Curated annotation (Swiss-Prot):
Keywords: Capsid protein, Cytoplasmic inwards viral transport, DNA-binding, Host cytoplasm, Host-virus interaction, Microtubular inwards viral transport, Phosphoprotein, Repeat, RNA-binding, T=4 icosahedral capsid protein, Viral penetration into host nucleus, Virion, Virus entry into host cell. Residues 159-181 are annotated as: 3 X 8 AA repeats of S-P-R-R-R-[PR]-S-Q. One of its GO terms (cellular component) is host cell. This is Capsid protein. The keyword Phosphoprotein applies. It is found in: Virion; Host cytoplasm. Residues 181-187 are annotated as: RNA binding. Transmembrane segments: none annotated. The gene is C. It comes from Woodchuck hepatitis B virus (isolate 2). Its main location: virion. A motif (Bipartite nuclear localization signal) lies at residues 162-179.
Length: 187
């Protein structure tokens, strides 16, 4: 069974696989970023968003993998076998966790739509033959104007918005019609 964990977010595992392996930060940096930006939302009891849930799940998976590696390291006597297993875990499962954390952190930071646009534009760029593509790859480093990053989650108090009065409108939205004079009125 081929399950795509990004399907519900409008993306795909295949699309993320076009990004080079060294594109994704190391796990410690991603965990530090998640903790610094969203610790309250990740440890709180309330459900914030599917992205928060996915980050929680990725962190739980990585924690379990770390425990497995520690157990294998202490129980496997052959240094060569231990190195092969640790490298395999880091190159396969570790990469999947890095991809997942990067994707969901980016969606929370930049907005899901912006991340999807970036992925599509990067795939188009990388699949275009070098002589025909621009020299620089698309980057996900600037915040679009419509993205707002809120600190403190949904529980933060917000000041009420002031509304500017709208211009007065005519009662009827249809165009005004002039009364045409009847031919008998001209007589």
């Amino acid at each position: 069974m081929d399950i795509d964990p990004y399907k519900e977010f409008g993306s795909s595992y295949q699309l993320l696989n076009f990004l080079p392996l060294d594109f994704f930060p190391d796990l410690n940096a991603l965990v530090d970023t998640a903790t610094a930006l969203y610790e309250e939302e990740l440890t709180g009891r309330e459900h914030c968003s599917p992205h928060h849930t996915a980050i929680r799940q990725a962190l739980v998976c990585w924690d379990e993998l770390t425990k497995l590696i520690a157990w294998m390291s202490s129980n496997i006597t052959s240094e060569q076998v231990r190195t092969i297993i640790v490298n395999h875990v880091n190159d396969t499962w570790g990469l999947k966790v890095r991809q997942s954390l990067w994707f969901h952190l980016s969606c929370l930071t930049f907005g899901q739509h912006t991340v999807q646009e970036f992925l599509v534009s990067f795939v188009v760029w990388i699949r275009t033959p070098a002589p025909y593509r621009p020299p620089n790859a698309p980057i996900l480093s600037t915040l679009p104007e419509h993205t707002v990053i809120r600190r403190g989650g949904a529980r933060a108090s917000r000041s009420p918005r002031r509304r500017t009065p709208s211009p007065r409108r005519r009662r009827s939205q249809s165009p005004r019609r002039r009364r045409s004079q009847s031919p008998s009125a001209n007589c």
